[in-house]
């Protein structure tokens, strides 16, 4: 299976949301990384066939998804940032309702609802109302509904926003587990969501694709540019004024700074191996990282 994004652009009035995006996807997890407003959601909505591009096209095995229409949508599982749910429905009833909308027979729906509830570890909560679920449970029901039609292409937009670390890890592991024979597109501004599971990472900024590579290859441009340094309290503000300081950790009466700099920021600075948090700051240091 091959999914191709061919020179896709999208504008809203005079504002350009995406500019000339070209990509190719096969099975595996692809992380789409960018700050808020970078064009991630617009890109995901176009690939999910929820929104039409202003120019360019998306192809599945060489065929335009606009021409495939419902045949393409049958292959899609989509989890948007906000999933509309009926709060008085139980988890089981909600999933059965969505299964009916997706055209599953009653027998098929019952079997599939049981399967996805088990997959997202919510079988014991099947009779509980979704309106009383925690944020993590709500996101898991969201991914469950996206999987009801056994999609070949799974598109999830900012799935872990607002979740605690335990739920984020659970969700990340679930996506990794189901990606063996699917294309999984995961958009996020939380680096740790994709660092361990992404086959490739796409970096979007201002609606443009600025990098696309494996996590290891993405880090090469900042090798030798990440430093750690112990300073006293007055040194913290001094180095923050001059350099990109990614992290500050207190160690007894001193502070350890993690600095991104083309040159050695201080004779005592020690070179460190870069990670994707460093990469994010390298590209989005002017953005607010949530």
Name the predicted role of every residue range.
Residues 154-158:
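Catalytic Walker B motif of ABC-type/P-loop ATPase nucleotide-binding domains
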Residues 96, 100, 107-125:
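Conserved ABC ATPase "signature" region
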Residues 35-39:
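Walker A (P-loop) phosphate-binding loop of ABC-type ATPase nucleotide-binding domains
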Residues 171-258:
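ABC transporter nucleotide-binding domain
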Residues 56-67, 71-72:
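Conserved ABC transporter NBD signature motif
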Residues 48:
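Helix-to-loop junction immediately C-terminal to a conserved catalytic motif
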């Amino acid at each position: 299976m091959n999914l191709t994004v061919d020179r896709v652009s999208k504008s809203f009035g005079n504002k350009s949301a995406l500019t000339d995006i070209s990509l190719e996807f096969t099975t595996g997890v692809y992380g789409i990384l960018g700050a808020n407003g970078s064009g991630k959601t617009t890109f995901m909505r176009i690939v999910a066939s929820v929104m039409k591009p202003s120019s360019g096209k998306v192809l599945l095995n060489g065929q335009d998804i606009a021409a495939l229409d419902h045949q393409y949508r049958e292959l899609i599982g989509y989890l948007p940032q906000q999933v509309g749910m009926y709060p008085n429905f139980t988890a089981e009833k909600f999933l059965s309702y969505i299964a009916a909308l997706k055209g599953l027979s009653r027998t098929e729906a019952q079997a599939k609802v049981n399967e996805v509830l088990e997959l997202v570890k919510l079988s014991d909560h099947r009779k509980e109302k979704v309106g009383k679920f925690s944020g993590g449970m709500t996101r898991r029901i969201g991914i469950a509904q996206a999987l009801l039609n056994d999609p070949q292409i799974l598109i999830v937009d900012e799935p872990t926003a607002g979740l605690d670390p335990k739920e984020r890890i659970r969700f990340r592991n679930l996506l990794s587990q189901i990606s063996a024979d699917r294309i999984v597109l995961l958009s996020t501004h939380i680096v740790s969501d994709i660092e361990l599971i992404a086959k490739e990472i796409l970096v979007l900024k201002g609606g443009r694709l600025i990098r696309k590579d494996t996590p290891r290859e993405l880090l090469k441009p900042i090798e030798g540019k990440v430093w750690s340094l112990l300073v006293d309290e007055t040194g913290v503000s001094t180095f923050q004024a001059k350099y990109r300081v990614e992290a500050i950790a207190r160690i007894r009466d001193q502070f350890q700074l993690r600095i991104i700099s083309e040159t050695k920021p201080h004779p005592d600075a020690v070179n460190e191996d870069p990670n994707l948090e460093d990469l994010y700051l390298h590209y989005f240091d002017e953005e607010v990282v949530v």
